[in-house]
Amino acid sequence: HDVSNPALANLDFMGTPPGDGTTVLPTEANPAYSYFHVERTWSEFMSSAYGQQGGAATNPEFQAQGATDIAWAAKCQDCHMRDVVGVACNKNGVPIRPDESTEHPDSGQPLHDLTGGNAWISHILASTDPNGPVYDPVNAQLLDQGPAVLTLDLNAGQTPKANGAALLAGSDRAKQQLRLAATIQNLAYSGGNVTFQLQNNSAHKLISGFPEGRRMFGNIQAKDAAGKIIYEVNPYDDTIGTLKGLPHSHSSPALGANEDYVDELVYEVHPSSSLTGEAETFHFVLATGRYKDNRIPPKGFDLARATPRISEPVWHGTSDPGYFSTQE
């Protein structure tokens, strides 16, 4: 889906209710993809080869890495609700798809798991189940303080404290999706230099979705004969939980000797805001543009389609359609 900020789009019409019959608000006259970028997963897909009429073949590497049954994709569900053998409901006489189905002889039963790429939160919630496979008493104590302390109430509804196995299974499926999403190709070493290509196997940008809390980075390590790291690009501090050497970050640890931060190998979005005067901002709700968007586009990415949808690459505050080559 595409998500945009209607409050900013309608800023010049403060106090005008939508649908009042006299004033047509910008959000009523224009598609959501045309103003104030928040998420653009749908636009990324529609600008890819997979979003064109009939879809496209998936990458051989995608299939080889575990998606052997997904050779073609033309809609989001082909990967996120993949076809399996099964029935559509638990009633008697329901045909098993696809073999027993006359209405859908060419497609299986879509698996309704809607797996994405967020493996972390499901795993953390799974760890609150005392009878589950990954119980962690520290996590359980922190998260089970009740709604008076936290907005989270682990004792309401379908509590994760009784569903650890199911939550862990969902986390594992998300990790599988992440493994399918990318392939490192053409890795070569020459004269102390390393070159490689990172291929996007998904039908949207790598990474996609809500950009404020998501990034992907390339980590390169050089080791001596004993296996000791002697040089590292984009080192990650597991204790703090972030990359080292991040500019403008108070929580990012300083780089050590023989360590480098390479921004081009950190694939992410940095919003900008003309309202706050920040070239790069954490005030996501006030974001009016993008300072950085170097996320890897999907196969067949059409800039003529992507640019009006505000999903073209951006580098240092400037729209940069040529950031990736035509071949890339």
What do these predicted regions represent?
Residues 2-328:
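Primarily the internal scaffold of c-type cytochrome electron-transfer domains
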